[in-house]
Each structure stands twice: as structure tokens, then as C-alpha cells.
């Protein structure tokens, strides 16, 4: 079983960093993957505590506007997730665990990526939790 940590916005967000470090301590030896949109920022943290880093594709400004318009038109909040999450979802199996971390990052804007990830997990029988 591997554990995937989602929702990290980079180690310069000290709350996210604290959640990642504490989670790795709790999880111990298990293979733990940090899914991030800031791989450069998180490189040292991953090396420091033994995490494998996976980066998901952040949207360009144009894509953000496009997907926002599509979400408004269709009412489907996970529009665009398939694009951003593919690199990560290709690796996850029903034997794994997905933990949605991020602390206060859920307060800044609607967490569409996290909502999409949670829906993906539910549809594929992958256990997930808001951590």
C-alpha cells in the first residue's frame, strides 16, 4: 500500500509543510508520495524526509478561465481534473490510500482539484480522507 498526499501548495506554506512532515512520521516506512504543483519548492522537503514527489499539471491562466467557464455552464465542478490529475491517477490503485492535506489552502479558492481527486477515488474504490 502506498500513501498519496494531495493538496500541498509548497513548503513555503508552513502549515502544509508541518502536515507533510507529521504525516510522514505517522506513516513511517510506507511508500509515501507528495503530489504537488510546486515541484521545485518541494524538492528539498521530499529529499529531506524520504518522500517521492509527483507533480500534477497546473493550469495556465487561459486554461483556468476555460475550465471556469465550462464549470459555470455545465455545473460540473470537476471539469478539467482529468487533464490535471492524469499523471497521478495513472499510478493509484485500490490498494493505496489518498489523504487530502492542505490546511488553510481550502480557504483561498474552491478546491476543484481536490474535489476531482476525491470523486476519482470514490469511483475507483480507493480509500481517501480529508487529513
PLM feature segments, named:
Residues 2-131:
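Aromatic- and Gly/Pro-rich donor/ligand-binding loops
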Amino acid at each position: 500500500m502506498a500513501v498519496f498526499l494531495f493538496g500541498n501548495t509548497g513548503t513555503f506554506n508552513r502549515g502544509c509543510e508541518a502536515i507533510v512532515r507529521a504525516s510522514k512520521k505517522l506513516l513511517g516506512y510506507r511508500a509515501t508520495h507528495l503530489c504537488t504543483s510546486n515541484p521545485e519548492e518541494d524538492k528539498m522537503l521530499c529529499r529531506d524526509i524520504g518522500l517521492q514527489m509527483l507533480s500534477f499539471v497546473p493550469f495556465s491562466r487561459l486554461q483556468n478561465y476555460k475550465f471556469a467557464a465550462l464549470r459555470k455552464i455545465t455545473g460540473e465542478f470537476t471539469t478539467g481534473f482529468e487533464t490535471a490529475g492524469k499523471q497521478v491517477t495513472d499510478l493509484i490503485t485500490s490498494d493505496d490510500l489518498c489523504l487530502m492535506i492542505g490546511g488553510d489552502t481550502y480557504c483561498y479558492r474552491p478546491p476543484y482539484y481536490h474535489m476531482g481527486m476525491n470523486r476519482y477515488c470514490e469511483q475507483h474504490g480507493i480509500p481517501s480522507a480529508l487529513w
